[in-house]
Amino acid sequence: MKSLQFCFLFCCWKAICCNSCELTNITITVEKEECNFCISINTTWCAGYCYTRDLVYKDPARPNIQKTCTFKELVYETVKVPGCAHHADSLYTYPVATECHCGKCDSDSTDCTVRGLGPSYCSFSEMKE
């Protein structure tokens, strides 16, 4: 019985104390207006859960900052979008996460909305792989 209680407490501790915010492979759609179509590329980004809470009593002296799984460090990679006009810039630079953590969402560099456009959004009807 004690081992069962220990196992239960260990699982609770693991769920509360250990975040599962980690690097994951995703496919994003990139587009250039000058090229009139989208391409899909594979990249790395952060995904997972972070410990957070929403207080019932809102204390103005203590700001309520919700933590989200976001990048700690990233690099930029560039891909050439095929089929662009000769006068157009066919290079597209996109971020690749190299390290993740649970922290405040930085709206200067990240879409912090509840429902953004999503990684597969394309404003053109033609999509190339």
From Swiss-Prot:
One of its GO terms (molecular function) is follicle-stimulating hormone activity. GO terms for cellular component: cytoplasm; extracellular space; follicle-stimulating hormone complex. Its main location: secreted. One of its GO terms (biological process) is positive regulation of gene expression. The keyword Disulfide bond applies. Glycans are attached at N25, N42. SUPFAM superfamilies: Cystine-knot cytokines. Disulfide bonds join C21-C69, C35-C84, C38-C122, C46-C100, C50-C102, C105-C112. The keyword Calcium does not apply. It comes from the Eukaryota. SMART domains: GHB. Residues 1-20 form the signal peptide. Belongs to the glycoprotein hormones subunit beta family. Heterodimer. The active follitropin is a heterodimer composed of an alpha chain/CGA shared with other hormones and a unique beta chain/FSHB shown here. Together with the alpha chain CGA constitutes follitropin, the follicle-stimulating hormone, and provides its biological specificity to the hormone heterodimer. Binds FSHR, a G protein-coupled receptor, on target cells to activate downstream signaling pathways. Follitropin is involved in follicle development and spermatogenesis in reproductive organs. This is Follitropin subunit beta.
